[in-house]
Amino acid sequence: MSSRKIIHIDMDAFYASVELREQPHLKGRPVVVAWEGARSVICAASYEARQFGLHSAMSVATAKRLCPQAVYVPPHFDLYRQVSAQIHAVFRRYTDLIEPLSLDEAYLDVTRNFKNIPYASEVAKEIRAAIFAETGLTASAGIAPNKFLAKIASDWRKPNGQFVLPPHKVMAFLETLPLGKIPGVGKVTLKKMQSLGMRTAGDLRRFERGELLNHFGRYGYRLYDLVRGTDERPVKAERERLQISTEITLPEDLPLEQAAGHLPHLAEDLWRQITRKNVEAQSVTLKLKTYDFRIITRTLTYSSVLPDCAALLQAAQMLIARVPPQTEDAFRLIGIGVGHLVPKNQQQDLWA
């Protein structure tokens, strides 16, 4: 078992918590972050809203039936990005091995840390305290020998808690771990596992590598390692991007049409980034990740720059239409990005 010390930090109901911080009169009420509209989906739900069954990626229409008294606030991605930058500034006091997964979560490798703190649990405790002191927001943390285990552990004491999974306890922990807790195991995969008599990671561990390959394709190889607590992926420090992008990991695997419901707010977020960086783009890329971790991308390149957010959204929707429908496919991530960047006003042609 690895001797690394990995922390997974996950902010608690991040978007909703930022909105509640800005509008404290809403505290205690079910708050939903979403644009209102017939085809809109929830970006985030406060813990009070979750008690009514509301969650991100749910349609606003469904949410209003389940919780008519919920308060809806539009997302403010520029603000979320500012707060995320504050949080990352806290991380950098301890390590430069930081791998952001989104605005509200990241992996940190603190095996060697700037403060020479021997216990990763103490590092996590200090980081969470600093985040709260400087932003007023709470975070949960998982501490483990690798990224897979740290991510699972961060969910164990939510909200505003942390859970340590030391190497000598990993196998016992995994023996009874429900399969639905394994990242990437969504409804489709879980149903197949259950049909094979699997209920826990311990059950899955009793299958040979070849059997898992037959049942789950190449994802079977990864499952074989994960249920044995093996994950050698390093924490990859963020590097300068050659494109600008935004994406969302869905709380459950969704069919393509439902996943595409996130495109309007992704496009709006991405357009804000483009505007703030004072650049223009000539290509748009759609990224999808399936339940079994296959990556699907589609790209459109134009002879001139995108003129506005509506054109960006239109391009993303055209790319969705290029994804061949597969009845078994369910998606756990959707994102869009732009490339072929040029400084604003350098490209004068009209978009066509």
From Swiss-Prot:
InterPro entries per UniProt: DNA/RNA_pol_sf, DNA_pol_Y-fam_lit_finger_sf, DNA_pol_Y-fam_little_finger, DNA_polymerase-Y, DNApol_IV, IMS_HHH_1, Rev_trsase/Diguanyl_cyclase, UmuC
Protein location: Cytoplasm
Co-factor binding comment: Binds 2 magnesium ions per subunit.
One cellular component term from this protein's GO annotations in UniProt: cytosol
EC numbers on record: 2.7.7.7
Name of a matching Pfam family: IMS
Function: Poorly processive, error-prone DNA polymerase involved in untargeted mutagenesis. Copies undamaged DNA at stalled replication forks, which arise in vivo from mismatched or misaligned primer ends. These misaligned primers can be extended by PolIV. Exhibits no 3'-5' exonuclease (proofreading) activity. May be involved in translesional synthesis, in conjunction with the beta clamp from PolIII.
Gene Ontology molecular function terms on file: damaged DNA binding; DNA-directed DNA polymerase activity; magnesium ion binding
Keyword Oxidoreductase: no
GO BP terms, alphabetized: DNA-templated DNA replication; error-prone translesion synthesis; SOS response
Protein encoded by which gene: dinB
Quaternary data: Monomer.
UniProt-annotated binding residues for Mg(2+): 10, 104
Residue ranges occupied by any UmuC domain in the UniProt entry: 6-186
Catalytic residues identified in the record: 105
Obligatory cofactor(s): Mg(2+)
Family: Belongs to the DNA polymerase type-Y family.
Site feature (Substrate discrimination) residues: 15
EC class (word): transferase
Main location: cytoplasm
UniProt keyword Electron transport, yes or no: no
UniProt xrefs under Gene3D superfamilies: 3.30.70.270, 3.40.1170.60, 5' to 3' exonuclease, C-terminal subdomain (1.10.150.20), DNA polymerase, Y-family, little finger domain (3.30.1490.100)
Protein name per the record: DNA polymerase IV
This protein's UniProt keywords: Cytoplasm, DNA damage, DNA repair, DNA replication, DNA-binding, DNA-directed DNA polymerase, Magnesium, Metal-binding, Mutator protein, Nucleotidyltransferase, Transferase
Catalytic reactions on record: DNA(n) + a 2'-deoxyribonucleoside 5'-triphosphate = DNA(n+1) + diphosphate
